[in-house]
Amino acid sequence: LVPKNLFGNTVYLDPIKKANHYASLLRNEEKCDLVICLSHLGFKYKNDKVSDMVLATQSRDIDLIIGGHTHTFLKNPVRMQNLDKEEVLVNQVGWAGINLGKVDFHFSQNRGSKKVFGRSIFVQNSSKEA
């Protein structure tokens, strides 16, 4: 992704393998009901480059991916299926605070039962210009 002279001894690790490792740890060992991945992979590319959409389909135990890098404006989160055919939400809301994202997860008393609602909120300039 970046020429070697610009990253020195930095090691690039496979984001899908790392995401799956830590999502499993959070879900199974720490018993988290909700696992959120903050990503800067980019929403989607024309080729098979790793992106938020690829991560969603190649992952397990992640409920929500909040992404960046490509500055994609989504009106609502995209619903994808992971390797276990479970729903993963992918969301980006652009850049520069133009939009805010809101995703609500409602959990029932029965572990594993949840409802999800998400949307983007357009931020308007509320100050008056002279």
Task: List each model region and its residues.
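Acidic, metal/ion-coordinating pockets
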Residues: 1-128
